[in-house]
């Protein structure tokens, strides 16, 4: 059994069952004929972004939102350290090596507020379509690079 098939089965089980913890998930995997080590299951849960949430006093394992844009937005948001502006442009500081991805994400949004982006290693220069829109553009960037 490969990793993809195993993780697909985990997603299927979580969509069809109310699972409170990894032990219960491991048992459901075994019941379906999949033999998985606890350490492997733990890694799979981390890679899939599975969280435990308390609902009505009970815990339930949940998959993250399946909307790819929302997932990417959250990932890109984690890479951003700060967003600062002056009268003419906006500078986004990122984790080292992440500026290109953040710049590409902003370019993909095709906002009329953004004339263009230039990315280095850890800095993105965002050039507004008009200097009159700096405040609106900064808010737009915060909204589109947030984790929520």
From Swiss-Prot:
Alphabetized InterPro entries for the sequence: Arg_repress, Arg_repress_C, Arg_repress_C_sf, Arg_repress_DNA-bd, WH-like_DNA-bd_sf, WH_DNA-bd_sf
Pfam families per UniProt: Arg_repressor, Arg_repressor_C
PANTHER family named in the record: ARGININE REPRESSOR (PTHR34471:SF1)
Gene Ontology CC entries for this record: cytoplasm
Highest taxon of the lineage: Bacteria
HAMAP family for the chain: Arg_repressor
Protein's UniProt keywords contain Transcription: yes
Places the protein is found: Cytoplasm
Family membership noted in the UniProt record: Belongs to the ArgR family.
A molecular-function term among this protein's GO annotations: arginine binding
Any GO BP: L-arginine biosynthetic process
Gene3D superfamilies reported in the protein's UniProt record: 3.30.1360.40, Winged helix-like DNA-binding domain superfamily/Winged helix DNA-binding domain
Source taxonomy: Bacteria, Pseudomonadati, Chlorobiota, Chlorobiia, Chlorobiales
Pathway: Amino-acid biosynthesis; L-arginine biosynthesis [regulation]
Free-text function comment from the UniProt entry: Regulates arginine biosynthesis genes.
Name of this chain's protein: Arginine repressor
Alphabetical keyword list: Amino-acid biosynthesis, Arginine biosynthesis, Cytoplasm, DNA-binding, Repressor, Transcription, Transcription regulation
Chief localization: cytoplasm
Protein species of origin: Pelodictyon phaeoclathratiforme (strain DSM 5477 / BU-1)
């Amino acid at each position: 059994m490969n990793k993809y098939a195993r993780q697909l089965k985990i997603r299927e089980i979580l969509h069809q069952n109310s699972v409170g913890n990894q032990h219960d998930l491991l048992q459901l995997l075994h019941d379906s004929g999949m033999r998985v080590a606890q350490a492997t299951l733990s890694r799979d849960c981390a890679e899939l972004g599975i969280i435990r949430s308390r609902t009505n006093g009970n815990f339930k394992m949940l998959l993250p939102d399946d909307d790819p844009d929302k997932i990417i937005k959250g990932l890109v948001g984690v890479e951003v350290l700060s967003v600062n502006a002056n009268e003419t442009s906006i500078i986004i500081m990122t984790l080292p090596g992440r500026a290109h991805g953040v710049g590409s994400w902003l370019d993909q949004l095709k906002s009329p507020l953004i004339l263009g982006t230039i990315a280095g290693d850890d800095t993105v220069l965002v050039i507004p379509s008009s200097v009159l829109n700096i405040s609106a553009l900064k808010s737009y960037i915060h909204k589109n690079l947030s984790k929520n």
